[in-house]
C-alpha cells in the first residue's frame, strides 16, 4: 500500500498497522485542483487504492479464519491436559480415542503420566510437564484471542476506509458527469441565444 497520495498533504492521513486512512473529499473541485489531477486520474488512483484495500481485507480475513480455527483447538488441548491432571494420582487409567489419520481412530489406555507432548508446529513436538503444558496453552489461548480482537478492529477500520473510498469514487465520478453536462449545455445555450 505504498502508492503516493495525490491529496497534496499526506500529513492529514493516518494509518492503522500499515493500512492508510482514506481521506473524505468534501469539495471535489478543490481536491482536483490541489492534487493537480484530472477526474480520470483521480478515479484511477482511488480505484487502485480500493483494490489494495480489498487485497489487505482478503489477507486479514484469512488470518481471522485461521485464528478462529486455532482457538477451539487450543481450548480442546487445555481440556485434555486438565483431564490428565485430574486423573493423575487416582490410579485409574484413562481411555482415549484419537485420530490417527482422517477418519481413522485408535484407542489408547493412558496410565498415570506427569508429562504431555505438544505439537509446536513445523513438525516439532516437545514434552512438557502437565503444569507447563497448561500454562503454555493458556498463554497461547490468550495471545490468540488478543490477536483476534486486533484483527477484528483492523477489519472494521479497513471496511470504513473502503466505504470512504467508494464514496470518494462516486463523488468524483458524479462531479465529472455534472461538469460534462454543464459544458454540453453551455454551447447549446449560446447557440440558442445567437439564433
From Swiss-Prot:
Q: Which domain of life is it from?
A: Eukaryota
Instruction: Describe the disruption phenotype.
Output: Reduced levels of alpha- and beta-tubulin. Altered development patterns and disturbed microtubules (MTs) organization. Hypersensitivity to high NaCl salt levels. Increased capacity to tolerate freezing temperatures upon acclimation (e.g. 7 days at 4 degrees Celsius) associated with a continuous accumulation of HY5 in cold conditions.
Q: Which cysteines are joined by disulfide bonds?
A: none
Query: Cross-referenced SUPFAM superfamilies, in alphabetical order?
Result: Prefoldin
Matching entries from InterPro entries are given as: PFD3 (IPR016655), Prefoldin (IPR009053), Prefoldin_subunit_alpha (IPR004127)
State where the protein is found: Cytoplasm; Nucleus
Gene3D superfamilies linked: 1.10.287.370
Q: Which UniProt keywords apply?
A: Acetylation, Chaperone, Coiled coil, Cytoplasm, Nucleus
| Positions of post-translational N-acetylserine modification | 2
Q: Which GO terms describe its biological process?
A: cellular response to gibberellin stimulus; cold acclimation; cortical microtubule organization; mRNA processing; protein folding; response to cold; response to salt stress
Extract the Pfam families matched here: Prefoldin
Complex formation: Heterohexamer of two PFD-alpha type and four PFD-beta type subunits forming prefoldin co-chaperone complex. Interacts with PFD6. Binds to the DELLA protein GAI. Interacts with LSM8, a specific subunit of the LSM2-8 complex, which is a core component of the spliceosome.
Q: Which family does it belong to?
A: Belongs to the prefoldin subunit alpha family.
Summarizing the function annotation, the protein's role is: Binds specifically to cytosolic chaperonin (c-CPN) and transfers target proteins to it. Binds to nascent polypeptide chain and promotes folding in an environment in which there are many competing pathways for nonnative proteins. Together with other chaperonins, contribute to the regulation of gene expression by modulating the spliceosome function on pre-mRNA splicing post-transcriptionally by acting as a co-chaperone of Hsp90 to control levels of LSM8. Required for the biogenesis of tubulins and for subsequent microtubules (MTs) organization and dynamicity.
Instruction: Give the protein's recorded name.
Output: Prefoldin subunit 3
Amino acid at each position: 500500500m505504498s502508492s503516493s497520495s495525490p491529496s497534496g498533504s499526506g500529513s492529514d492521513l493516518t494509518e492503522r498497522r500499515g493500512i492508510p486512512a482514506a481521506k473524505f473529499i468534501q469539495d471535489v473541485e478543490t481536491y482536483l485542483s490541489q492534487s493537480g489531477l484530472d477526474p480520470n486520474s483521480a478515479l484511477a488512483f482511488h480505484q487502485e487504492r480500493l483494490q489494495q484495500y480489498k487485497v489487505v481485507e482478503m489477507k486479514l480475513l484469512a488470518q481471522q479464519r485461521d485464528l478462529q480455527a486455532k482457538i477451539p483447538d487450543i481450548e480442546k488441548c487445555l481440556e485434555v491436559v486438565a483431564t490428565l491432571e485430574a486423573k493423575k494420582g487416582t490410579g485409574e487409567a484413562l481411555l482415549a480415542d484419537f485420530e490417527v489419520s482422517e477418519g481413522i481412530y485408535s484407542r489408547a489406555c493412558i496410565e498415570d503420566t506427569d508429562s504431555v507432548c505438544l505439537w509446536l508446529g513445523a513438525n516439532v513436538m516437545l514434552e512438557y510437564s502437565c503444569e507447563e503444558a497448561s500454562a503454555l496453552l493458556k498463554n497461547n489461548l490468550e495471545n490468540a484471542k488478543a490477536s483476534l480482537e486486533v484483527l477484528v478492529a483492523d477489519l472494521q477500520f479497513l471496511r470504513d476506509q473502503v466505504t470512504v473510498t467508494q464514496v470518494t469514487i462516486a463523488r468524483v465520478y458524479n462531479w465529472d458527469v455534472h461538469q460534462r453536462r454543464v459544458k454540453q449545455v453551455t454551447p447549446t445555450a449560446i447557440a440558442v441565444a445567437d439564433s
